[in-house]
Design a protein with these regions (language model features):
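Polybasic, lysine-rich low-complexity intrinsically disordered segments
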Residues: 7-13
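Conserved G/P- and acidic residue-centered "switch" motifs that form tight phosphate/ATP-binding loops
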Residues: 68
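ATP/NTP-dependent adenylation/nucleotidyl-transfer catalytic domains that generate, transfer
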Residues: 27-63, 73, 77-80, 84-151, ...
């Protein structure tokens, strides 16, 4: 029987480094059936981001745009911070940093998001730098697809952190709660300073994106609508050329993010409940459940190094 890792006692705070333990407390089974108020989610993410910038004397938000769902939704949040707090004169700088493994669909979607949401933006191709670093690293040991992907992620972060340094800003993180719990991110790579969406499961990020292009940016001729709609429908990849089908292709082929989220939440809440564990095993297959949970356990070491995340209970209507 799989058992839940003991939860540490944490003080309630807006920002927590080990975000999952505090977030999971607000996802009780009987409450999780209630609909999330995505207006409240979005407004909270905008206001908390602005508060953090102001409190720490920061003037710019730096975001690497991949063209995917998470970075596009984060871009919409940053855009709204600039719009709602003009007196602070915040700057939102977006940069697309592709290598040869990024698809044309991703690059086009990133371009849409930059033009729609950023106060300043550009594209910087890092393929030449990647090949140079890769060749240097391979002088002693051969690289693997994962190590090559990590080089790309870390090169991007070098670029973004340098930009944050010279503009008095911080680097925005775009990982979601599903990725945090599966370890689908690179230490010193795509994990950054501050994460507005880190308390949302992946399927909830989809719902937030849908809310934005159906309730907030509703003009179909507007770049904001087009960017969000494109990101909502884009084919998921890992952005580093490791696995063409993205996260789900690696651990749960044929399953959706919502199903994987159900596996993770059930295990983390009810890992010692035979009936609940049997439910997910029957629903998704014992092999799939074990693959997901093995990935979660093996990535535990990564979750010791987390960015600042907006606490879920500030916007979750299930609280």
């Amino acid at each position: 029987m799989l058992s839940l890792i003991p939860k540490p006692k944490l003080k309630k705070s807006i920002f927590v480094n080990w975000c999952f333990r505090i977030c999971i407390k607000s996802i009780e089974p009987e409450k999780s059936k209630k609909a999330m108020n995505y207006k409240k989610v979005f407004d909270t993410m905008v206001s908390e981001t602005a508060n953090y910038l102001t409190k720490n004397g920061l003037k710019s938000m730096i975001l690497g745009l991949s063209g995917g769902l998470d970075s596009t939704v984060t871009a919409a949040i940053c855009h709204e911070v600039v719009k709602r707090y003009p007196e602070q004169q915040f700057k939102f700088i977006g940069v697309s940093l592709p290598c040869s493994t990024n698809t044309a669909e991703e690059n086009d979607s990133a371009s849409l998001a930059m033009k729609a949401f950023c106060t300043e933006y550009w594209v910087e191709n890092l393929q030449a730098q990647y090949l140079l670093v890769k060749a240097t690293c391979e002088q002693r040991y051969a690289s693997t697809p994962i190590s090559q992907g990590n080089i790309k992620a870390r090169l991007r972060m070098i670029y973004l952190y340098n930009l944050a340094s010279v503009t008095g800003g911080l680097v925005m993180d775009t990982d979601n709660l599903t990725e945090h719990n599966l370890g689908f991110w690179t230490i010193h790579g795509d994990v950054a300073d501050y994460n507005p969406i880190g308390g949302l499961w992946k399927h909830e990020v989809y719902e937030l994106c849908k809310y934005l292009f159906t309730e907030v940016f509703t003009d179909e001729n507007c770049p904001s609508y087009q960017a969000l709609r494109a990101a909502y429908g884009i084919t998921p990849t890992d952005g580093n050329g490791v696995e063409a089908g993205g996260d789900m292709a690696q651990i749960a082929p044929g399953h959706t993010y919502e199903e994987v989220d159900d596996i993770l939440k059930t295990y983390l809440q009810h890992g010692d409940d035979e009936q609940e564990m049997k439910r997910i095993s029957d629903a998704y297959g014992a092999e799939t459940v074990e693959r997901v949970l093995t990935r979660h356990r093996k990535s535990e070491f990564k979750r010791k190094r987390m960015p600042l995340v907006i606490e879920r209970s500030l916007y979750d209507t299930c609280e």
